[in-house]
Structure formats: structure tokens, C-alpha cells
């Protein structure tokens, strides 16, 4: 008697697998990671040693030139933090993004993973539904229709009509 819905309001990233001329993807490089790029970014932003965080978080060799980029990005971020700027400051957000990009670049290169954007993308997102009323969430639909279906669910007693599954 419970409707379960799993969906997203948008997609992000525009992930490309097998970037580059060889058209091969290497997910094994990703599987070797011990921490995500976001986790490592947060650790470094919180003041932890960049080299230690990277060495503990990466399961692949991290290029020394890239480590220099990470250290510089961390230094730039710490300077802003010492000036009293917080996460809401646009300069801090920009510096944090620069740090995360420096951390992510080697794993993207090693795995041959590309990204079309750091923002939202326009492709359809999946919606999964199970239970009474789930038939209203099948096929392609505008996101506003999904919202309307949820509102309709609360207006009506769909639990009494098991034929809607």
C-alpha cells in the first residue's frame, strides 16, 4: 500500500566514457580509488595536507606536475580562508572548484572519462516507481508531470485501487 518513487530533477556532468582517440574506457582506474575527488577536496579544504590526502585517496600514481597544481590550488583556497572568506563567497567556491578539478584530472585521464560540463545537462532522467499508482510514472514525461502525479497521489486514495500498479 506504499508508492515508492526514485527520480532526479536533472542530470549533471555529461559523462563521456572512452574519451580520446583510442576509444577505450578504463574503469579499473576508478575502482582503485579509495576516496572520491569530492571527499579529498573537502579534506584538503578543511586544512589537511594535500599530498597526504592524495596519496591515501588515490589508488593510482598521481603525476607530480598535477600534485603541484593541487598544492597551488590548496594554497590559493587557504589564503581566501585566512582572509575570513567562507564557503558562500564566490571566490572560495571558484577556488574550491579549481582544487577539485586538479584532483579529478588524473583519474579522468587514467580512466579515459570525459565531462561535457560541471553543470546541469539536458538528457532525460530515469524515474522508477513501485506500488499503487506507479503506472502514472511509466514512459517519458515532463518533470512537471511527475510532480503533478505526486500531488494527485496525495489528493486521491490510490491505495484502495490496486489496479493502478
Q: Where are the model-predicted features located?
A:
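A post-motif C-terminal structural segment
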Residues: 1-164
Amino acid at each position: 500500500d506504499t508508492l515508492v518513487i526514485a527520480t532526479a530533477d536533472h542530470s549533471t556532468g555529461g559523462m563521456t566514457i572512452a574519451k580520446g582517440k583510442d576509444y577505450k574506457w578504463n574503469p579499473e582506474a576508478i575502482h582503485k580509488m579509495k576516496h572520491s575527488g569530492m571527499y579529498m577536496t573537502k579534506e584538503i579544504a578543511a586544512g589537511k595536507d594535500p599530498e597526504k590526502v592524495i596519496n591515501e585517496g588515490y589508488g593510482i600514481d598521481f603525476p607530480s606536475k598535477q600534485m603541484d597544481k593541487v598544492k597551488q590550488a590548496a594554497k590559493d583556497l587557504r589564503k581566501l580562508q585566512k582572509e575570513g572568506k567562507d564557503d558562500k563567497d564566490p571566490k572560495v567556491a571558484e577556488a574550491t572548484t579549481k582544487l577539485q578539478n586538479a584532483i579529478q584530472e588524473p583519474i579522468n585521464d587514467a580512466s579515459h572519462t570525459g565531462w561535457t560540463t560541471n553543470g546541469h545537462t539536458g538528457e532525460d532522467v530515469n524515474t522508477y516507481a513501485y506500488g499503487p499508482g506507479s503506472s502514472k510514472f511509466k514512459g517519458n514525461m515532463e518533470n512537471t508531470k511527475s510532480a503533478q502525479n505526486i500531488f494527485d497521489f496525495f489528493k486521491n486514495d490510490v491505495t484502495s485501487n490496486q489496479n493502478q500498479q
